[in-house]
């Protein structure tokens, strides 16, 4: 099968719902992954570690294409990182600014993802390294070299490349045409009709999601995916690493925007998918990286469930109990003892945030670690909701209760309790996605407990949905037979 045929978009299909939890759809997703694993067209065994070997056998631009997907050495020197940046600039300049579209066949069907992934990884690691050198002042020679090259691996340059690839390929217009059941080739143009540009443009959208999330702009991160449908037919779902990355950053963005129900749904999808395909991933190079990310998502979903208690898939719940056990129970219980645990889990599972601007090498004390900054923002949210589980446990026992009486039970001042109740009520109103773009949704009450305060009297009402036993039986019957 040619690259053209493998990367061509489906002609027309109706919009699919992102929240597709039926076992039929899940099994179809797993079967689709099996086909990808066993598909053999002469390039299925080509992976990132063999790209260097391919580069040595080719000439010119073809060698650059393969080399661009090759990971940089873990302890690469600063000069090597500068040279890698220059190589990427040269490659993207040629692809974007040639007199006409570059007519090249890509080395493999997932090459475009490898290039964008490695490009952003090197940008992220360089930014963190530069910030660390500026804060510690441990190597004056390297600090001087970094000071003299502020634009190397600059945020503007990286974003410019990603946006240019998207614009040149007309990929957003193509995706919009697919949604409208129209022919994407009618709007693709000379560049977008070629696999090289179409694939680079498509995965640049996923790259933008990642970069904006690393920069802390979570709303813009989700906005970039407006034209991509989050379902099993999307192109990113054909590449396991891209599939995992997309759902990780979408879920994390939802979590930081306090849309915990959407974050749990997003994380649950990819965790279930990985659990059903892990037997086909073992032995592949990306397996260890995915297993590590899987543990990170388990930590994030534990945090989200502590803020928004909900039923989880049996597989996920078992994974949480096995991985965290008592820690998971402590999170759900809340209170001051849970604070260090929240910070530990967040730091271990969050992206490695970066700063959009170069650090101040002359004033090291002014440089803040972006991870520390976002952790502090997150911990402020934790402190605001730390006593919600305890407060709710008392409220569930009554239909009306005096504010001062409850304050006495909790051993806090009445006005302090009033502020807790207000925060808890505000946090229980969340935007929940149903259809449309990822930022869209309707405001719903995410808690099974509601209350209103009249003077010093608390009026409490509890609405708990019954368990849908029919769905439970159908799911388990399908698994058994």
UniProtKB/Swiss-Prot annotation:
Location within or outside the cell: Cytoplasm
Coiled-coil ranges per UniProt: none
Cross-referenced InterPro entries: eIF3l (IPR019382), PCI_dom (IPR000717)
GO molecular function, one term: translation initiation factor activity
PCI domain: residues covered: 262-457
GO BP, one annotated term: formation of cytoplasmic translation initiation complex
UniProt keyword annotation of Flavoprotein present: no
One Pfam family linked to the record: Paf67
Cellular compartments per GO CC: eukaryotic 43S preinitiation complex; eukaryotic 48S preinitiation complex; eukaryotic translation initiation factor 3 complex
Cystines in this chain: none
Domain of life from the UniProt record: Eukaryota
Region named Disordered: 1-22
Thylakoid keyword on record: no
Alphabetical keyword list: Cytoplasm, Initiation factor, Protein biosynthesis
Subunit comment: Component of the eukaryotic translation initiation factor 3 (eIF-3) complex.
Function noted in UniProt: Component of the eukaryotic translation initiation factor 3 (eIF-3) complex, which is involved in protein synthesis of a specialized repertoire of mRNAs and, together with other initiation factors, stimulates binding of mRNA and methionyl-tRNAi to the 40S ribosome. The eIF-3 complex specifically targets and initiates translation of a subset of mRNAs involved in cell proliferation.
Protein family: Belongs to the eIF-3 subunit L family.
Protein's name in the database: Eukaryotic translation initiation factor 3 subunit L
Protein species of origin: Coccidioides immitis (strain RS)
Taxonomic path: Eukaryota, Fungi, Dikarya, Ascomycota, Pezizomycotina
């Amino acid at each position: 099968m040619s690259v053209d045929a493998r990367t061509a978009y489906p002609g027309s299909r109706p919009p699919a719902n992102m929240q597709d939890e039926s076992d039929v759809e899940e099994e179809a997703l797993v079967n689709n992954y099996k086909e990808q694993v066993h598909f053999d067209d002469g390039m299925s065994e080509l992976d990132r570690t063999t790209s260097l070997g391919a580069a040595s056998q080719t000439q010119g631009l073809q060698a650059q294409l393969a080399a661009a997907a090759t990971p940089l050495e873990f302890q690469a020197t600063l000069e090597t990182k500068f040279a890698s940046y220059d190589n990427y600039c040269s490659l993207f300049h040629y692809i974007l600014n040639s007199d006409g579209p570059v007519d090249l066949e890509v080395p493999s069907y997932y090459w475009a993802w490898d290039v964008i992934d490695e490009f952003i990884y090197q940008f992220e690691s360089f930014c963190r390294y530069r910030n660390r050198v500026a804060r510690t002042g441990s190597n004056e020679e390297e600090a001087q070299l970094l000071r003299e090259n502020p634009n190397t691996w600059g945020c503007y340059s990286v974003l410019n490349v990603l946006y240019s690839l998207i614009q040149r390929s007309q990929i957003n217009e193509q995706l919009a045409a697919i949604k409208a059941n129209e022919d994407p080739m009618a709007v693709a143009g000379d560049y977008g009709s070629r696999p090289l540009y179409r694939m680079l443009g498509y995965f640049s959208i996923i790259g933008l999601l990642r970069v904006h999330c690393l920069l802390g702009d979570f709303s813009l991160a989700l906005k970039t995916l407006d034209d991509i449908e989050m379902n099993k037919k999307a192109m990113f779902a054909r590449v396991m690493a891209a599939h995992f990355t997309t759902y990780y950053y979408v879920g994390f963005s939802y979590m930081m925007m306090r849309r915990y129900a959407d974050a749990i749904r997003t994380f649950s999808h990819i965790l279930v998918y990985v659990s059903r395909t892990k037997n086909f991933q073992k032995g592949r190079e990306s397996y260890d990286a995915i297993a590590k990310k899987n543990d990170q998502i388990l930590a994030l979903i534990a945090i989200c469930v502590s803020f928004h208690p909900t039923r989880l898939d049996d597989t996920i719940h078992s994974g949480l109990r096995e991985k965290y056990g008592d820690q998971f129970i402590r999170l759900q219980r809340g209170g001051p003892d849970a604070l260090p645990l929240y910070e530990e889990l967040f730091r271990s599972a969050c992206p490695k945030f970066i700063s959009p601007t170069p650090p101040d090498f002359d004033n090291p004390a002014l440089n803040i670690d972006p991870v520390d900054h976002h952790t502090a923002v997150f911990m402020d949210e934790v402190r605001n909701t730390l006593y919600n589980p305890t407060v709710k446990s008392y409220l569930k026992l009554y239909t009306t209760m005096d504010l001062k009486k409850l304050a006495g039970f909790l051993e806090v001042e009445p006005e302090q309790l009033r502020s807790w109740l207000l925060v808890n009520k505000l946090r229980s109103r969340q935007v929940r996605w149903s259809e449309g773009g990822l930022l869209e949704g309707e405001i719903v009450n995410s808690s099974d407990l509601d209350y209103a305060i009249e003077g010093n009297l608390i009026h409490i009402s509890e609405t708990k949905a019954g368990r849908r036993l029919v769905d439970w039986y159908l799911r388990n019957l399908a698994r058994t037979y």
